[in-house]
């Protein structure tokens, strides 16, 4: 019998205000009763604005935060965001000319930006787009992503994981995961029970980019023992995919959609998107397929997504993304079970 998990999609009403509109390759995070959103593209490879959009779950309205302090100077796509306490952290991304952005924080109480790290300099992380991001109370974790070259000779995609110590304001790198660990962009990253989980992503082939592929591997780094482990999962496994939506719900990593076959024109084309969802139990290592309730979902990838607690439940928040005909949407959804 196939393993399934019943949940419900809720389409979030957007009642007004200066909304971000249709876009993909953007990022978002929740602090309290507000969601913060940044970056993205409407046409493939062309960035949009550099506003920080704020959605208020109490009123279901959008606003734009005043760019107070050391705000990002570059409008970018492939950027990532995570919340720690009352601050959000924004890492990387690029514009259509492959100018790359840096590392910033935004204090949601003071409503003020702060520049933290100039990327691509000695002894700091190299600039990149489409990495994966996660955090615990003390650290921001960045895995993989697409390189621009930087100060060192790098692969087209990274397989390294870099760590920002929030209290000290310093960067370090986790141990090398070994030769069999795939360099990837557009992967999922989550911290659960002192383990840093890496899920799926678009991987480098051994033939130098000709046969790059979407992976469905799952690995974790044990933050206590300092070791990388590749796990064997069972159940109803997802196919290989990248740039999917994901969130942590309890001990489960929930994923939705994503690109399952790359377009022959790369990022410029529509690719083949999925409309399936899955949940991985990180204790039993069993995948279950999500049975959708509520709003029917279209194949979708390249969304902004995060874990959020709204309507009294914790679940997956997802905005925008690329649809099957290479169009972008501004739909806003919440999934929980």
Swiss-Prot record:
UniProt GO cellular component terms: cytosol; nucleus
Record: active site: 94
The organism's place on the tree of life at top rank: Eukaryota
Reaction(s) catalysed by this chain's protein: (Z)-phenyl-N-(sulfonatooxy)methanimidothioate = benzyl thiocyanate + sulfate; (Z)-phenyl-N-(sulfonatooxy)methanimidothioate = phenylacetonitrile + sulfur + sulfate; (Z)-N-(sulfonatooxy)prop-2-enimidothioate = 2-(thiiran-2-yl)acetonitrile + sulfate; (Z)-4-methylsulfanylbutyl-N-(sulfonatooxy)methanimidothioate = 5-(methylsulfanyl)pentanenitrile + sulfur + sulfate + H(+)
Binding positions (a (Z)-N-(sulfonatooxy)alkanimidothioate): 46, 94, 130, 151, 186, 202, 243, 269, 299
Reported impact of residue 148 to A: Reduced activity
Required cofactor(s): Fe(2+)
Signal peptide: none
Regulation of its function: Stimulated by the presence of Fe(2+) leading to an increase of nitriles formation. In the presence of EDTA, strong reduction of epithionitrile and simple nitrile formation from allyl- and 4-methylthiobutylglucosinolate, respectively, but increased isothiocyanates accumulation.
Top-level EC class as recorded in UniProt: lyase
Effect noted on mutating residue 273 to L: Slightly increased activity
Expression sites by tissue: Mainly expressed in seedlings, flowers and siliques, and, to a lower extent, in leaves and roots.
Substitution effect: residue 46 to K: Increased activity with allylglucosinolate but noormal activity with benzylglucosinolate in the presence of myrosinase
Effect of residue 263 to A/N: Strongly reduced activity
Binding-site positions, Fe(2+): 259, 263, 267
Gene Ontology MF terms: enzyme regulator activity; lyase activity; metal ion binding
Entry keyword set: Iron, Kelch repeat, Lyase, Metal-binding, Repeat
Stated pH dependence: Optimum pH is 9.5.
Pfam (any one): Kelch_KLHDC2_KLHL20_DRC7
Catalytic activity, EC: 4.8.1.7, 4.8.1.8
UniProt KW Lyase keyword: yes
Kelch repeat feature ranges: 34-82, 87-133, 139-194, 203-248, 252-307
Extra information: Does not contain the mannose-binding lectin domain present in other members of the family.
Chain's role: Specifier protein that contributes to constitutive and herbivore-induced simple nitrile formation. Catalyzes thiocyanate and simple nitrile formation from benzylglucosinolate in the presence of myrosinase. Converts also aliphatic glucosinolates to both epithionitriles and simple nitriles.
Name of the protein described by the UniProt record: Phenyl-N-(sulfonatooxy)methanimidothioate sulfolyase
């Amino acid at each position: 019998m196939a393993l399934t998990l019943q949940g419900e999609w809720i389409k979030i009403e957007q009642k007004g205000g200066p909304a971000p509109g249709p876009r993909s390759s953007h990022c978002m995070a929740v602090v309290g009763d507000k969601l913060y959103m940044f970056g993205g593209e409407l046409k493939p490879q062309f960035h949009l604005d550099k506003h920080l959009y704020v959605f208020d779950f109490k009123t279901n309205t959008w606003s734009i935060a005043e760019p107070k302090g050391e705000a990002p100077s570059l409008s970018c796509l492939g950027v990532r965001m995570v919340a720690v306490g009352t601050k959000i952290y924004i890492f990387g991304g690029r514009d259509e000319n492959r100018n790359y952005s840096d590392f910033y924080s935004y204090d949601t109480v003071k409503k003020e930006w702060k520049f933290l790290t100039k990327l691509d300099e000695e002894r700091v992380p190299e600039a990149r787009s489409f990495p994966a991001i996660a955090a615990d109370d003390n650290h921001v974790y960045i895995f993989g992503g697409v390189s621009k070259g930087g100060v060192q000779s790098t692969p087209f995609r990274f397989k390294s994981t870099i760590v920002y110590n929030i209290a000290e304001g310093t960067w370090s790198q986790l141990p090398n995961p070994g030769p069999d660990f795939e360099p990837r962009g557009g992967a999922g990253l989550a911290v659960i029970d002192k383990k840093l989980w890496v899920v799926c992503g678009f991987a480098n082939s051994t033939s130098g980019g000709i046969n790059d592929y979407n992976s469905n591997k799952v690995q974790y780094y044990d933050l206590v023992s300092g070791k990388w482990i590749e796990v064997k999962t069972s159940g109803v496994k997802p196919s290989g995919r990248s740039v999917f939506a994901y969130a942590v719900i309890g001990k489960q990593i929930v994923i939705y959609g994503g690109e399952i076959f790359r377009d022959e024109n790369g990022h410029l084309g529509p690719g083949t998107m999925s409309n399936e969802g899955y949940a991985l139990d990180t204790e039993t290592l069993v995948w279950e397929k999500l049975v959708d309730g509520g709003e029917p979902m279209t194949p979708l990838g390249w969304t902004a997504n995060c874990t959020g607690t709204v309507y009294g439940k914790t679940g997956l928040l997802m905005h925008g993304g690329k649809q099957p005909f290479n169009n972008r949407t501004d739909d806003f959804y919440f999934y929980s079970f």
